[in-house]
Amino acid sequence: MKKNITIILSSILFAFGAEHASAMNMSTEYDATYAVTRTDTAKLSLDRVIEIHDTLQFDKTIEEAPSIAIDISIPVVKSLNKDISKKLDRTLASMIFEEEESSLDKAVQVFCRNRKEEFVLYINELINDDGDNISDFSGFFYNFFYGITADVESGWNGYINYTVTQEVYEGGAHPNSYKSTIIFNPIDGNTVTLDDILKPGYKEALTALLTTKLLEQYNAKTIKEAQEIGLFINETGVPIPSNYTFGDNGIVFIYNTYEIAPYVFGAIHLTLTYDELKDLLK
């Protein structure tokens, strides 16, 4: 018997100028079972949420001196099996923070420390290179911010979709936002990919389906028309993205900003239903 309970953790929007104290808030208010498949003894649940709200101003004596803000709100998924819980924890640490063989808590701390150190180094280099005072580098363009949030939901076949959204501003015309995904098997905590659910040799056919779906979504009859409206696509079709989720009704393929279109398009989501994929599914 398959049981699906979906929890979506809403994104945290943060005001850059707000005063926050650095904290590691471990919340248990979201505790729930996400999915049970094939056996009622195999469960993944939301253990807690790691929350960080941290700011650092380069020079507190100057009101508009450059500053950095870091907002993190990410759920920790656990299993009844301690070894699986450890595997999940390290997998997320590697996926989100590129910290190998590290716990998620430790990876968060290292991320915050490194970003603040890099920010201070960057501002110091600006001052030293230009021979100016810190007051010459006030304003939005010299402020940094990092926001990391995550959504967790159960989907097709009881698999657990874990989607991370990162918002980054390190100077420039606008911030950048991108998503990364990972899918867990609730039975053993292993990751699940397209290779696990689609038949060998699926890539050419999947590329064709995605290309057709993209053209339909933007009312383009040909690849040339798609190119004319700004999409980055050639005669071989749209590439298969590395980020996707197994929804209840279909696979959602996620193209981050700049992957297949200019910034103004934002992220592009293409959904192929399982009926559309029936010839490719194992």
Range-by-range predicted roles:
Residues 21-282:
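Compositionally biased intrinsically disordered regions enriched in Thr/Gly
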